Amino acid sequence: MGKIIDGKKIASEIRNELKEEVKKFTEEGRPPGLSVVLVGDDPASRTYVRMKEKVAKEIGIYSKVDYLSRQTTQDELLDIVDKLNNDEKIDGILVQLPLPDHIDEKAVIEAISPFKDVDGFHPINTGKLFSGMTGQRFEACTPLGIIELLDREGIEIDGKKAVVVGRSNIVGKPVAHLLLERHATVTVCHSHTADLGIETRQADILVVAAGRPKLVKGEMVKEGAAVIDVGTNRVDGHLVGDVDFEAARQRAGYITPVPGGVGPMTIAMLMKNTVKARKYHGV
């Protein structure tokens, strides 16, 4: 029976650590600043934005939210991003995705200063990750949170076989590269993988981010593996992951629940990136 990795508890520990760092910055002159921009009135997006605002306030980060109507044009949004790029009180900028169809997401992401891109989506930041450049870069929050979970549970990455199910630019690809940086042997699986079970049964670390409820069954998990379930799917009014939790837990050494596993870590890493951005700006 695998140990359940408590993402809520670990995220809370990280927030408490960040509070101390934020306190020092505040005493030195100003707290880290985070600006979130929401276009439209998508209920899920509004919920995420409120959660981010609440956590920022709890930690002591200066938080600014722009609620824009769905009719906001791309040029108007780009103008707001430009102003935020030049606002010295703002260290991190996050434009909540998805955006309305008439706005080009790539253009907006590229307009954010890479030094304020706390979501880690700017091509310069992803390019630094994919080319193995360290130093001043931001990693996407969910992949960063996955690595943090593994580290804080004392799960060895170096030399282990890691399998990532899913190849999105938001989770699959960046987490694969972060695992590679830590010297794991990494396989990325996707919708064209011939036999998913053959691949997953080899994994010491199994990260599942496919967006398909209970895609990974219990028999597809290696005995003693660490299973990180990134999926959030609503089925019959309940949130379920991409892994059949109860069946997989019988074989796994560690497993994240849904909800309460990876989710809380994503917001914690956003705050960590904002504090990191404040360090970069240094004023």
Curated annotation (Swiss-Prot):
So what does this thing catalyse?
A: (6R)-5,10-methylene-5,6,7,8-tetrahydrofolate + NADP(+) = (6R)-5,10-methenyltetrahydrofolate + NADPH; (6R)-5,10-methenyltetrahydrofolate + H2O = (6R)-10-formyltetrahydrofolate + H(+)
The alphabetized UniProt keywords are:
Amino-acid biosynthesis, Histidine biosynthesis, Hydrolase, Methionine biosynthesis, Multifunctional enzyme, NADP, One-carbon metabolism, Oxidoreductase, Purine biosynthesis
Report the InterPro entries cross-referenced here.
Aminoacid_DH-like_N_sf (IPR046346), NAD(P)-bd_dom_sf (IPR036291), THF_DH/CycHdrlase (IPR000672), THF_DH/CycHdrlase_cat_dom (IPR020630), THF_DH/CycHdrlase_CS (IPR020867), THF_DH/CycHdrlase_NAD-bd_dom (IPR020631)
Does the entry annotate any disulfide bonds, and if so which pairs?
none
State if Secreted is listed as a keyword: no
Enzyme Commission number? 1.5.1.5, 3.5.4.9
Entry GO CC: cytosol
Where NADP(+) binds, per the record, is at G166, R167, S168, S191, T232
Does NADP appear among the keywords? yes
Please give one Gene Ontology molecular function term for this protein. methenyltetrahydrofolate cyclohydrolase activity
Q: In which pathway does it act?
A: One-carbon metabolism; tetrahydrofolate interconversion
The residues forming the signal peptide are: none
Q: Which CDD domains match?
A: NAD_bind_m-THF_DH_Cyclohyd
Gene3D superfamilies registered for this protein in UniProt? Leucine Dehydrogenase, chain A, domain 1, NAD(P)-binding Rossmann-like Domain
An example GO BP is: methionine biosynthetic process
* Cited Pfam families: THF_DHG_CYH, THF_DHG_CYH_C
Q: Which PROSITE patterns match?
A: THF_DHG_CYH_1, THF_DHG_CYH_2
Subunit and interaction comment: Homodimer.
- Family according to the record: Belongs to the tetrahydrofolate dehydrogenase/cyclohydrolase family.
Which HAMAP family does the record match to this protein?
THF_DHG_CYH
Its biological purpose is as follows: Catalyzes the oxidation of 5,10-methylenetetrahydrofolate to 5,10-methenyltetrahydrofolate and then the hydrolysis of 5,10-methenyltetrahydrofolate to 10-formyltetrahydrofolate.
**Protein name as it appears in the record:** Bifunctional protein FolD
Q: Which organism is it from?
A: Halothermothrix orenii (strain H 168 / OCM 544 / DSM 9562)
- This protein's encoding gene: folD
